[in-house]
């Protein structure tokens, strides 16, 4: 039996990529940091698109919506995550020319810390509400069909 909750494994892969990105920042490897963040962004955007185009319509139509589980909450968080990644990319491109690099890097890492808390909050909502409810309201055939339409999947432990 397959579960839609298996798609949450991608979150671990994204976390690994983001960790590698932050490690590159700490070593002043700004091109590598940007490249890793772009890879992270690709996975994140694809995952968001899968959720918004494939999974959330089913959830919106059939789920028993509990506190904290309104479909709009997930959409709003997706928007915030996408906007944050855009900001981080923009700021990383400025780092090589930054006259006060230490201050700017600390500022950027603070922003990334906030971003990670937002990601953790969003992951918790998906782990505790969205995916368990999707697993509950879909049949085996529906799960198979939905999984066939999902486009994003890293091979866990090979993300970086």
Where are these regions (language model features)?
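Small-residue-biased structural context
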Residues: 1-160
């Amino acid at each position: 039996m397959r579960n839609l909750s298996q798609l949450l494994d991608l979150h671990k892969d994204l976390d690994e990529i983001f960790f590698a990105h932050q490690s590159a920042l700490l070593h002043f490897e700004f091109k590598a940091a940007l490249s890793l963040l772009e890879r992270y962004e690709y996975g994140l955007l694809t995952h968001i698109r899968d959720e918004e185009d494939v999974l959330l319509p089913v959830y919106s139509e059939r789920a028993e919506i509990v506190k904290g589980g309104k479909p709009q909450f997930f959409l709003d968080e997706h928007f915030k995550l996408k906007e944050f990644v855009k900001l981080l990319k923009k700021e990383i491109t400025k780092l090589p020319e930054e006259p006060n690099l230490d201050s700017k890097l600390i500022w950027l890492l603070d922003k990334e810390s906030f971003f990670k808390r937002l990601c953790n909050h969003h992951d918790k909502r998906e782990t505790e509400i969205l995916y368990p409810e999707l697993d509950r309201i879909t049949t085996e055939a529906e799960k198979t069909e939905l999984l066939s339409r999902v486009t994003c999947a890293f091979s866990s432990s090979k993300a970086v």
